[in-house]
Structures are given as structure tokens and as C-alpha cells.
Amino acid sequence: MTMMTPPPVDQPEDEEMLVPNSDLVDGPAQPMEVTQPETAASTVENQPAEDPPTLKFTWTIPNFSRQNTRKHYSDVFVVGGYKWRILIFPKGNNVDHLSMYLDVSDAASLPYGWSRYAQFSLAVVNQIHTRYTVRKETQHQFNARESDWGFTSFMPLSELYDPSRGYLVNDTVLVEAEVAVRKVLDYWSYDSKKETGFVGLKNQGATCYMNSLLQTLYHIPYFRKAVYHMPTTENDAPTASIPLALQSLFYKLQYNDTSVATKELTKSFGWDTYDSFMQHDVQELNRVLCEKLEDKMKGTVVEGTIQQLFEGHHMNYIECINVDFKSTRKESFYDLQLDVKGCKDVYASFDKYVEVERLEGDNKYHAEGHGLQDAKKGVLFIDFPPVLQLQLKRFEYDFMRDTMVKINDRYEFPLELDLDREDGKYLSPDADRSVRNLYTLHSVLVHSGGVHGGHYYAFIRPTLSDQWYKFDDERVTKEDLKRALEEQYGGEEELPQTNPGFNNNPPFKFTKYSNAYMLVYIRESDKDKIICNVDEKDIAEHLRVRLKKEQEEKEDKRRYKAQAHLYTIIKVARDEDLKEQIGKDIYFDLVDHDKVRSFRIQKQTPFQQFKEEVAKEFGVPVQLQRFWIWAKRQNHTYRPNRPLTPQEELQPVGQIREASNKANTAELKLFLEVEHLDLRPIPPPEKSKEDILLFFKLYDPEKAVLSYAGRLMVKSSSKPMDITGKLNEMVGFAPDEEIELFEEIKFEPCVMCEHLDKKTSFRLCQIEDGDIICFQKPLVNKEIECLYPAVPSFLEYVQNRQLVRFRALEKPKEDEFVLELSKQHTYDDVVEKVAEKLGLDDPSKLRLTSHNCYSQQPKPQPIKYRGVDHLSDMLVHYNQTSDILYYEVLDIPLPELQGLKTLKVAFHHATKEEVVIHNIRLPKQSTVGDVINELKTKVELSHPDAELRLLEVFYHKIYKIFPSTERIENINDQYWTLRAEEIPEEEKNIGPNDRLILVYHFAKETGQNQQVQNFGEPFFLVIHEGETLEEIKNRIQKKLHVSDEDFAKWKFAFMSMGRPEYLQDTDVVYNRFQRRDVYGAFEQYLGLEHADTTPKRAYAANQNRHAYEKPVKIYN
């Protein structure tokens, strides 16, 4: 993901990343640029005579699907005295999503340096169910450079244009903007440390969720002290050690003057850049991080700290009403998940948590020795921890919409929380009543935005004083109690009205999308222990030394950077550098300037004084030095261009640098010419216009080696033949040795190296200062085979050579072999070389797959036979080039395979338990019937006349029975499992009063949610009218071969939309199920609840969860 220049105000992240509209082609919007204003109606609700600083604007856009302009603007509306409008791209701003921005309508005519800050939300209204309205919220400091801001990927166009979704009704779209204009913030000059005594954490891309959690943990001093006391050594690397990385982070938060980076910590988690750009679940991160620390604290002086701070216990109980039977189970917790929906406040959530559930009627409890009994089921707390972490369930699964939704309801939480209230109603009989469970609020973690992303920050009272602080990434501010508590309750807020009598409409209310999702309370009786003093003596000596050294180095760099404008960097290349580098590090041009000696000289220093520095460094007297300025030519080569004049050498170095390169950050690059005679320097001869400085490279075709030979000053009127003797002498050839000369002209984008006529003058050959001439002995002995017989072919090879790492596709992490190839190799050349390496007779049986540089995985689609022209096309991925290719060895030639479709089919035998996977390969135009016929030739059937069917299975559920006429080219077996099975006789003979139902295995997740998880193999079952569950159970037990002992533990439920309704043996199952042709019937099934004893196997990523549901993992 690429993010444009970040805004000056703290930037919330969203999954699509907030960006300004970078529509450079169309240029900035003009003040009056309104597209078809007469076709779009706009209304402003509650706009009194004087505009309030907060306002809601509604824009009705008719004929939406017929909009043929790329950009579309709303009417102008005024908020806080400023003019605004909404800008949309109906077909997306170069993406397959609707793009939508808030725009300053008169930006082009505003005075220089204008700026304004607004918090705003943009929405596309769902006109069928308003609760499904898509709304996104952000804030931005608008200025001339960024006069619009919003969301390039607001919502998928496929959803927007689908009339059944409710966003486009009668070809009309409703867009809403809620804008609050705030005081302009001077972001850049704000000093968090100076203003508050605390510093923030830098955001790596989408890590504000982690920053808010880390600040909360850091401000629990007992926790911080324990982290400091975890044993680490000076040999540990912070990027590989979580304890050391966390110690380092906490130390910097305590002693730095500016915000702190978290990259070391995320690297110690084993995260790559991609992980840092993923918005993870904060609650999950908290649990995983604490589990890791708990594990790493074992066997150390701080073992048990995590449990001491955060661990509490509750008792799950089931108590029979009519018989003397009670079952209890003690469980520990590190945090509690509290319901928000339907609860007024924290106390209401605790009431709900301990609410007694009655098990009666169809849901009786099976008590050992007593059979089915009416019972009470509930939870009571044995003890609470000193630090109580409450996770508020702001995100819930909406079964009707099949998606996650955010609960923005008002939910209150007190400054002081008394969990002993009403005579200890939350406590179990075993609880220690001498412990006073009175808690004080320490932290409020806030989420601003919607379910698909947003921004996280925290309000914290570090010492439990009356002063609150807001920790929002890099920025820390002082806040009052109202901001930390009441404003984070969520719910709705009324827009202010300056003239309540202006009309009789009720005040407009808008939903607040910023609200608390996690609360941290500290027990009053443990306050002094937890809010303890933490100072330098708690920090290991090696850590203090390391971090102070880091700080000093950082300060040196900062000082160096701050003084950079006073200095000029001069890089001096010499003959010795050319000799060292040509033929080893470089082949084209003359030198890599990053590897030559550089001097940092004050800009005002006279050049003559700099020459004295050079004399000291290289031992070359000042009078023997001559310096040449380098220049970039039009063909992108970089050569010495001209010597400095005596007048220039009287100037300061800064002036010379500026004359040679106007860029402020540019360096002054020079070539030092020193003349040698008997190894002693002599003054360089005076240079006239007739003199040309040339550089020479020697090529040895037998060894394929290029080296630097030296340089000569030649007359432009002379000819190459005049200097062949000197060149031979230079490299130790016989004086009359025949040599060929070539001019190295350029190497980008392709090599140009041309033969030089020895009898034509340098002037006529257009040879000038800084040109490079390569020479070699001609190949006389034709028996000697040379891959690159002449300079041009060798330079062509060097420019295009590419080392490629080949990996077997089934082992995508392991390099198997490396081949040196040419970027110009054709598809056929590449597969021939690979086949030769593998000892394969037929190269057409190889299939190659390119590498995805971002995911570090093979691309999903292989390279088609002769589908690319050259190796260079195989290695490129967007703007990056890889050096990895994956290969497969096929059993038939690739061109033949490309005309076929291969399906992976799992065959389930009617009587055998073993499932066998078959690869069925058929022409693409084949049908499912052809697949079944092919499969019949490969499998053993229970009887010769058995009929087969093909099913689509996903997440242990059956989604489709394929009709035999369906063509296979559109069937996807990458994400779905294709299952073939015999059709049972009873299904073939199904009667008019029978029903075919789905039967799935399931288990409930442990914990408060108790979400249903399917597992195992789903199947069909015929049920008959009037048949009871008991009769069906007998058939299921027989079908699945389950022992009586195990089967007695199974429960049976009618499942609809993911919710179980438990059945009794006497229930008639038939009545529960709708006909198969009724909408929604596919979501109804008979659920078999029992323990999952199937062997676990690693699913592919796409079988496990979607990319955006990536779990939090700390690998180290």
C-alpha cells in the first residue's frame, strides 16, 4: 500500500488507507467547478442564520449509474464560515471502489498560507436498512497542498451498483457528510515532552492499535519494572529478543525527549513490514503479548508477574433444582469481555455476565446418575485481579448481514468501580470477602471509525491523579475528565443550535463513532504497590550503556543533519579507485562514487585550503594536483567533463559545488589527475582545447576479464593508431602488438559499444574529454573458443546477466539451485537451461511460476507456455524485480496441459473410511458428467451400478451439488473442496413426503462467546414425515459407526443461521426443516454437537481465514 504525504494532524488508518485525491491529470479543482449541479439535490439539516461549527450535509445524486464524468462535485455548503463540497469519483479514482473526498471549494482563491482543520465523516446511505450505511470518519488539516482529503477506496463498486444491496435505489444515491471545524493545530511545533512530561510512539503504517496498548502497559509501573528486571545480556539483539526490545522501548519512553519508534519491537515479534501494515485485533495482541512475556519470565526473578497483575478466577456452575446435584469448574481469566449491546453501563454488563440461565424444557441438563433435570447455570467470581482489564464488545457478528458490525451505542463506565456492590452479588461463596474490590479507572482505550478500520488512541491517568492524558501515536496532550470519560461513552450527540426558535424541527442527532473499547481499572488496595517508583537502578547496566550510546549516536546524526547546510561533501576519485573497482565492482563508466574518499568541508573554505587537506590525505603536493569536474551526459553516463580553472580554485568550495550542481543536497564530485614519472608525481602539463583526457580499459577475451589500463592526454587531431604503442606499453604488450579499439558510449537502456577506426582522427570520431576506449588483442587462434570474443559482446553479457534462484513449487521457501542466465534469454532458452540442470529430456514438461515480491510467495497463476518474451519479463513484479523463479515438472507437455483443466477431487467411498484424492484432467470444455465418468475409471465402487455426484464443500459445509451438465472451466478447486461420493439408494428413491437435509458436526468455542465451529465431514440425510429424533439418531449412529459410549455424549440441534435449538428424542425433526427450494434453507441443518476428535491438519491460508482476518502472531 502506498500512502501519500501524511497530514499534519494525527492520521487515522483505514484498511484502504486515507489519501488526498491525487488527481494530477485534471489539476486542482476550480472554485466554481460543479458538475451538473442541476441534477443533484443537496440539503443541509438545521442550518440556522449563523453557521454552527458542526453540520450535517446530505447530497442526493439522481441518475447515478448514468454519470459519465470522471469527477462529480456536490453543491457548496458552509461550516464554521468556510466553504466545503464533496468530491466523488463514481467509477473510482483508478481503483474498483467508489472514491470520496471532502474538498475546500475555494482553495484556488484563498490567501497564501491558508490552513483549516476539520473532523468529518463521509457516508453512503443504505436506503433499505440504514444500519448498513457505510460511514467512514477521519480528520485532516487542509491547506493549499492538500485541499481535499478522504478515501480512495470508500466502498466496492460491486456493492454500490448492486440494486439489491440498498445503496442505489431508483438509480439514486444518498451521500452524507458530517463536518466539524476545529481550531487549527500547530502540529509541527508541538512538544509533547515539554507540554506533558510524556512522549508518544511513532506509527509504522497501521500500528496505532498497538501504540495505545503499549502506552497503557508502560503506564502500569509495576509491569514496567518487571519488564526491566527480565534477564537480558549485552549480546542479545533487540530485533530478536522480545524482552530486550520491550526494555529498550520502555526506557526510551521514560527518558527520550521525542517520540519513540516501535520497529525493533515488531521485528522481535517476527513481523515483517506487511504485518505492521495490517490492523490487528488489540484484544488478541494484548493476550498474545502477555502470554509470550509470561512464558519468557518463567525461571527468572519476575516469574509470575503477569498472573499477579492480571489474573482473576471465576466459577462456572450448574445446579439442579429438584435433586441434590451441582457441577462447578474454576477458570482463570486475564481480561473480561463485557457485552455493550443492551447494557447501559459496566454494572449492567456484570449483571448480565453473572445472569442465571435456566436449563429446562427441551434444554434440560443431563446430570450424572439423575438423567435429564431442570437446572440453573451461571458464573460467579472467586477473585478479581489487582489490574482489571475489561474488553468491551464493540464488534459483533451480524447473522442477517453475514458480517461484523460495530456497536456505537452509548455505554457508561464509572471513575470508581465497586464490584462488592449489593452484598457481593458477583462473588462466589468461596470468594475471600476480606478483599475490598473497589477499583479506580486508569486507562480508556478508544476506537474511532468503523468495523473495517479506523484509529486507536488512549486516555491514561499515569499516577491516578485528576490529570488525564491523551496518547495518540506521536502526540500526547493534557485532557480533562469529560474528554476521557463522557465523550468516550459513544451513542448520539446533538448538533448545537445557535437559534433554537428558528424552526420547530427536533435537534439533529449524529452517531459518535469514537468510543471506548477497553478499560483498565486498578484496585484501590493495590494502588501503592502497582503505581510504584521506577528509576534507572531498575534498568540493567548493559541496557543503560547501550541505549545512552544509541542516544549519543542519534544526537550526533541530528547535529550532523542540522549543520549539513554549512558543509559541502566532496568526493575525490583517483586512478587507484578506478583500478580497484573496474572489472570487480563495476564494468560501465569509471567509478562508484560511494566507495571513494569523501571530505566534509565547510562551504566557505577556499578551494586552495581543501587542496592542502588532499595533500595530507594522499601525499600529493598541492602544485601537482589537478581536479576535474564530473558531469552527467544526456545518455546518462557520468564522466570527468573539464578541469577546474585557476580562477575557480580561488573560490570557496560551496560556490564551486553550486556552480556544478544547483541541488542543495548535491555533493561535489571530482577526479584527481596526478602525473607520474618514475613513480614520482610531476606537475600536470597545461591543457589546451586541442588536448583530450581519455580513459582506457583492457579486455582479455580468453579469460573474459575487463580491467582499468590507465589514461592518456591525446591531441584531438591525432589518430588512434598514434597511441597504440603507448597503450601496449601501458599493459605490457609488445610495442607492435595488433590491438582492436572500441568506444564505450552508453549502457542504459541498452549497451552501445562501437568499433573505433584507428585511421580516423579523434575529432572526426567525435571523441571528447572523459570518453572511455576499450581495447583488446584480436582473436587470431580460431581454435580457442570464447563465449564473448569481443568487447561489445562481453559488455552486453555483463549488462544482461542475471543470477536466478530456482525453487521447486512444492517447497517455495527453499532455493534448490542457482543459474546464471541472461535477461534477454527467451522463454525457450530459460526452460532449456533449467531442463538441462534437472536432467530432463523434454523442456516443454517444465512449468515456471513468477515470484510475488510483496507476499514473498509464488504468484497464484503460473507462466503460460511461451507466455512471455524474455527472462526479464518473468522476473518483474510491478515496479520491483525479483531473482526467484519456481518450477514444476509435469507428466505431459505444458502446451497440451494448458488445453486441459485439472480438478482435485476427494473421493468418499460408500463403505470405506479412507478418503482418496484424485487429480482429474480433462479438456476445459468438458462437463461435470465427464469428470464423474473419468473418476469411475479410477475408483472402486461399492457395486457396478453405483451413481456418483460432485459436491462443493467449504469450511465443513456443503454448498452445492453440481449438475452433470455444468462445464468444468469455471469450477474453482483452489478455495473449495470438491467431493465425489456415491448417491445412496435411499436418496434415489426419495418419496414425496421425505426431505433431504444437511447434517454437520459442530462444537462450541470455550469462553463467553460460545460461537459454533463446524468440523468433520458434512453429509446428506433423508428424513421421513413424522420421524422422531430418536429414530434418526439410530440411523446416524449406524452410518457413522460411533460406539454407544461416545454417542451417548452427543447432542442434537436444529441449526438455523448459526444458532442451535437443541432437540429431544421425541421431537419430530421433519417439521423443523423447510423445503430445499425455500430461500434460506441452505443455512438450516441438523447439527451433531460433540468433541472434535478428527486429526488436525494445517489448512492452506485461504482455507483458514480471509487475508483481512489475519490473526495476531508473535513468532519469536
Swiss-Prot record:
Superkingdom of origin: Eukaryota
Ranges of Pro residues composition bias in the record: 1-10
Keywords linked to the UniProt accession: Hydrolase, Protease, Thiol protease, Ubl conjugation pathway
Enzyme class: hydrolase
Annotated region described as Disordered, given as residue ranges: 1-52
EC number per UniProt: 3.4.19.12
Protein name, as recorded: Ubiquitin C-terminal hydrolase 12
Source organism per UniProt: Arabidopsis thaliana (Mouse-ear cress)
